[in-house]
Amino acid sequence: HTITHTEEPGRVSIAKGQGDDTIIRTIETNRLYGGLSERIETVRGINDAEPVACNRSVRQYTDGGWLLVSETEAFNTPLARTTSYEYNSQYRVSRINRPDGGYTRYEYDGEGRVTLEAEPWAGGGEQVTRTEYAGLRFYDNRPARVAEFRVLSDGTEIELTAAAYAYERSPLMERVTKTVTAAGSGQEQTSVEETYGEAAAYPYAAGQTKFTRDIAGVETFYDYEAAVEHGAAHKKTAVTKVGGELAAGQSRKTESFLAANDTVLVEQESIWDGENWLLLSSGAHEYDEEGRRTKTTRGNGRVSATSWMCCGKLSETDEDGILTSYGYNSAHQLVETIRSEISDGDTVITPETITTYTRDAAGRVLQTRRDRGAMTTTESVEYDRLGRIVRQTDVLGRVTATAYSENGLTETVTTPAGATLVTERHPDGSVLHEYGTGQRERCHVYDIDHNCLRETVTLAGQAIILSRTLVNGFGQNVVQVTPTTAGFLYDRSEYDEQGRLIRAWRDAGTQEGAVAMTP
């Protein structure tokens, strides 16, 4: 592979590859007025009339050093989109302004830690995350409480979720307990993680995970010791339990034998049957000098292997003996995969499959061709200067075109049949409006109801409700409302503290017709 590096005053060019594969990356730097400096980076193929990517960044020198002022994608084109940055008196980012009208603003405490992060919300205000810090040691960046709010347009703040962290520390162990509460739910979700301290009995274990308990109550205990088998340096054992006890048919033990560089040489998994550990699976692994796995031998004798080159995988053979080979061009891009024929005696089950990729200088796939036996299919994709898909052609030659508004929030898809589907979004990604050929025009409205996030879908004019969904702070769907000829049906859901659905029922605004569901 060839890489050529050329330098001129204020300009660096790096050419990668040979012949038609060559990709040229150019970086220009220029001094501007007012202590500003610009950096323009372009990427193009050797045969491209125009770059496939051109980005510009502007920095300003201040008492706080060089600060990023703006970044522009698709620079010097009609599609150019600029993100700008604002800073506070301490030279920390206070606001990021995005080209779609969105933004992120930050507030800091006296030690420079982020205490507030806010972005616009489709409900009319902001979605805000506030962070308080533990302060148990010097410059303690560990959170004590992280809360997510929705700030309504009238300034009212509604807390949706709050995660509280408790810390314990000793020479033998460090423990973090996380307790999450959420609006619209009376449950608490608690998880625990412990790590071995610096005085761990086995020095290698220091800083390693000792114990975890997830919100479902599943506990995993980790143990480390010196290994005396398989040429390993360390042995790691992980055992799952519930309430500190082994559960028949559920508890599992995973034993990993580790080399000095932490690669797994041998691993085996067992399940507890109530009296003994029964082996489920095992495997021995081999690696090359760069630590990449080259061979795995399972306990049942089945073998898989992988060979590597500088670009990535050269070939791999799975446990069924199926060989997949990979081909790269001189610019290190994957351009071909060949999957060997699968046969049963003289009967061909799946013929050899060759997949060929045509890529642009940015590495994006422009065309995919698949040759499977005597059958050939081709599909292609076109992108704009911002890297967005604007045209897709499927294997049957059908074309789907996509157009975007200037701010990128409206997407118009034209199907192969000529129909148009238009989707308008809020800067936070939420769908606001959907309409097009042959479909009902729908509006999405977001707000807060009963301390839950509510999404209401209506027909145009917002007089007729199609659906209404309430989601609590845990992200659990608690009520789904659908209209009927006589009114509305309410599908309600109830969850336990482990996040499992335990009860669901339907009513017309009453509590009748409950249907219990087992966890």
PLM-predicted stretches and their roles:
Residues H1-P519:
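Beta-strand elements of repeat-based all-beta scaffolds
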